[in-house]
Amino acid sequence: MQHKLLINGELVSGEGEKQPVYNPAMGDVLLEIAEASAEQVNAAVRAADAAFAEWGQTTPKARAECLLKLADVIEENGQVFAELESRNCGKPLHSAFNDEIPAIVDVFRFFAGAARCLNGLAAGEYLEGHTSMIRRDPLGVVASIAPWNYPLMMAAWKLAPALAAGNCVVLKPSEITPLTALKLAELAKDIFPAGVINVLFGRGKTVGDPLTGHPKVRMVSLTGSIATGEHIISHTAPSIKRTHMELGGKAPVIVFDDADIEAVVEGVRTFGYYNAGQDCTAACRIYAQKGIYDTLVEKLGAAVATLKSGSPDDESTELGPLSSLAHLERVSKAVEEAKATGHIKVITGGEKRKGNGYYYAPTLLAGALQDDAIVQKEVFGPVVSVTLFDNEEQVVNWANDSQYGLASSVWTKDVGRAHRVSARLQYGCTWVNTHFMLVSEMPHGGQKLSGYGKDMSLYGLEDYTVVRHVMVKH
């Protein structure tokens, strides 16, 4: 397995402390990788800064060609990437290969095209004898911090728009799941000029802090927890860096009495538990209207009970393990606290799986109240709660009564209600009669403590640019 860092176009071994990388399906160590040293972090940023002088002035066509080549290489090595992701994350291999790899390839191809469409406004004469124009220029060096739930996907979401806009990137994948990013580094080094892409390995304290705090870094892009986002914003405040934050969510799933209950059950069974629920948009916080509540709980409980946990290599496996032992304990603790309320009922699941690996049973909890922790706090595991509501006004208020604001869904046959409720929800995305549908052309990003900035779409590309005014006297 490729375990070297990419710095200035060369694969080099880390010079810092070695860290174990685990196989969560078995709970054993896959390998140990040496972190980047402080000197190597500095070297990576300096290399990116030096490369920016030329890369930032390349034509959109040239940048697009590099991105398309990278997309092709990922596609050609799709099986290799899927196997690495499966071993390092515990994802079912068939899901990694069939769902994630095509989406990752599409992200690079989308931004290759978008790079050639980015422009500033052609302005005019707002002062006699002077012509103004607006430019959208790259910022410089971008430090990108990727999470452990979708390691390669999130690396793509960060690399593609930043590079398309003309920036140079230093990427730090999670120390828990670095293998696909390091493999990507190996393939990218022969496509992009030296220094344009750099990939480091290490923990937040030893590598993340010196990277994000480096004076030559102009922007920091993070997908991670609220706590990590707070830390980076505070850490980078003295240098006034631009920050781009995607910090998780607790998606409300609003089910009205007139909803297609079979569609709701199928949707939540799939999108509440996909990737073992380790998804910031997971359909995890159901609000069911009183007329449909009992039926939904019964049917959804039966459906969730059929979800198959197992080996990532098994074609029939739907749920793999959680990412780490520490995360397994966090999920288990959240469910135990919910049980202890006395009014929350475990419909199915609610326990760790016996045997090797970090498995938690797919869980459905009914009877949750608005102020319960299981409703208000992100669990990030295969755990879905159901809360009863009376009317539209109440459920909109409850849905918005959350520190999160990333994703939501509304299930109803009433088109007017769908538009009305969607307009009032304080979430970056609202799906109607579906959930978890993502396309490269549409923006993904939240509000409130879920963060700010957009991934994907032309809005995502613009986030990696600076708007400049040029005035010419004539």
UniProtKB/Swiss-Prot annotation:
Its EC number is 1.2.1.19, 1.2.1.-. NAD(+) binds at A146, P147, W148, K172, P173, S174, E175, D209, S225, I226, A227, T228, C280. Pathway: Amine and polyamine degradation; putrescine degradation; 4-aminobutanoate from 4-aminobutanal: step 1/1; Amino-acid degradation. The keyword Oxidoreductase applies. GO terms for biological process: L-lysine catabolic process; putrescine catabolic process. Keywords: NAD, Oxidoreductase. GO terms for molecular function: aminobutyraldehyde dehydrogenase (NAD+) activity; NAD binding. 4-aminobutanal can spontaneously cyclize to 1-pyrroline, and 5-aminopentanal to 1-piperideine. Catalyzes the oxidation 4-aminobutanal (gamma-aminobutyraldehyde) to 4-aminobutanoate (gamma-aminobutyrate or GABA). This is the second step in one of two pathways for putrescine degradation, where putrescine is converted into 4-aminobutanoate via 4-aminobutanal. Also functions as a 5-aminopentanal dehydrogenase in a a L-lysine degradation pathway to succinate that proceeds via cadaverine, glutarate and L-2-hydroxyglutarate. This is Gamma-aminobutyraldehyde dehydrogenase. It comes from Escherichia coli O127:H6 (strain E2348/69 / EPEC). The gene is patD.
